[in-house]
Swiss-Prot record:
SUPFAM superfamilies: Aldolase
Domain of life: Bacteria
A molecular function GO annotation: transaldolase activity
Pathway entry: Carbohydrate degradation; pentose phosphate pathway; D-glyceraldehyde 3-phosphate and beta-D-fructose 6-phosphate from D-ribose 5-phosphate and D-xylulose 5-phosphate (non-oxidative stage): step 2/3
The protein, known as: Probable transaldolase
Provenance organism: Geobacillus kaustophilus (strain HTA426)
Family: Belongs to the transaldolase family. Type 3B subfamily.
Catalytic activity reported: D-sedoheptulose 7-phosphate + D-glyceraldehyde 3-phosphate = D-erythrose 4-phosphate + beta-D-fructose 6-phosphate
Function per UniProt: Transaldolase is important for the balance of metabolites in the pentose-phosphate pathway.
Enzyme Commission code(s) on record: 2.2.1.2
Subcellular location: Cytoplasm
Cytoplasm recorded as keyword: yes
Name of one Pfam family that matches: TAL_FSA
Biological processes, Gene Ontology terms: carbohydrate metabolic process; pentose-phosphate shunt
């Protein structure tokens, strides 16, 4: 499973990139708004750092508007992926982008049927939202398993991005259940490194080394 980072913060992206684990970035209008910067300028900055997929979301609600927005976003860099909502109009846009060779990420996926529809429209990625399903008492991780099984049975190449990741357990379980990618907030990404026994082991090795000097 690959790691994307879910942020529009440049310092977070730079740090994750320096760690050597970053395969891509996902953004959305809310994340960009927090940064108080030009959307297009920030995308240029991100794509100058990250060579993998960088998801940029359209805000139009009709297919024609999404296509117009997406075509402009795709001009920023060849690794821009157009993030499109899981709606009938969104899937019309996905089909058009697919025919033009523009990558797409269908977001706000909450059912296996939605994921299958998006894949058949030509989506490069689908993003089921784990945390938001958990919030309403549904099993987001089970959804990952179901989508992965359906895609495997039918030979579908669309990749599954586990999104709305809230904690490290989501990451582990998404990997076990067949997600191709986890897009992870910076805070959760850094939590993946931590275990008290790792810290204790380092301290012991250093103490032992210093004693023998």
């Amino acid at each position: 499973m690959k790691f994307f980072i879910d942020t529009a913060n440049l310092e977070e992206i730079k740090h994750a990139h320096e760690l050597g684990i970053l395969a891509g970035v996902t953004t959305n209008p809310s994340l960009v708004a927090k940064e108080n910067v030009s959307f297009h300028d920030r995308l240029r900055e991100i794509t100058s750092i990250v060579s993998g997929s960088v998801s940029a979301e359209v805000i139009s609600t009709d297919a024609a508007g999404m296509i117009a927005e997406g075509e402009e976003l795709a001009k920023i860099a060849p690794n821009i992926t157009i993030k499109v909502p899981m709606t009938p109009e969104g899937l019309k846009a996905v089909k058009a982008f697919s025919e033009k060779g523009i990558q797409t990420n269908v977001t706000l996926v909450f059912t296996a049927n939605q994921a299958l529809l998006a894949a058949r429209a030509g989506a490069t990625y689908v993003s089921p939202f784990l945390g938001r399903l958990d919030d309403i008492g549904h099993n987001g991780l089970e959804l990952i398993s179901t989508i992965a099984e359906i895609f495997n049975i039918h030979g579908i190449e669309t990749e599954i991005i586990a999104a709305s990741i809230r904690h490290p357990h989501h990451v582990t379980e998404a990997a076990l259940r067949g997600a191709h990618i986890a897009t992870v907030p910076y805070k959760v990404l850094m939590q993946l490194f931590n275990h008290p026994l790792t810290d204790q082991g380092i301290e012991k090795f250093l103490a032992d080394w210093n004693r023998q000097k």
